[in-house]
Amino acid sequence: MNDDTRAEIILDLCAVLGINAEQTEADDYKLLIAKLNTAIRAIKSARNYPASYNDKKIADDLDNYYANIFDLTIYEYNQTGAEGEISHNENGTNRTYKSRTECFVGVIPFARRVM
């Protein structure tokens, strides 16, 4: 992901999650960045880039998956402390989490030719 796009997604994520983007030493900001990095790595892995792709081509391509990276980061951030749960019920509050794989809809891996 290119630096400008990364800065944009961080601001958007902070706005949605109510995190102060200027307090980069705050625990919630650090957690968000860790979840963003995890999401970027997951999309990279799902894309299965060929060896011919250099870092610039990968970064440019990842910009096309802004929405997937955004959704996956939100998913991972909101699952903090509830990893592995698919639903949660406490004091009359019911939560059902979507599947993590739904965040990968539209992420198409590169195919490899077997010789």
Indicate residue ranges for each PLM-predicted region.
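Conserved short "hinge" loops at termini or chain/domain junctions
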Residues: 1-61, 103-115
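Short loop/turn elements at secondary-structure junctions
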Residues: 2, 57-115
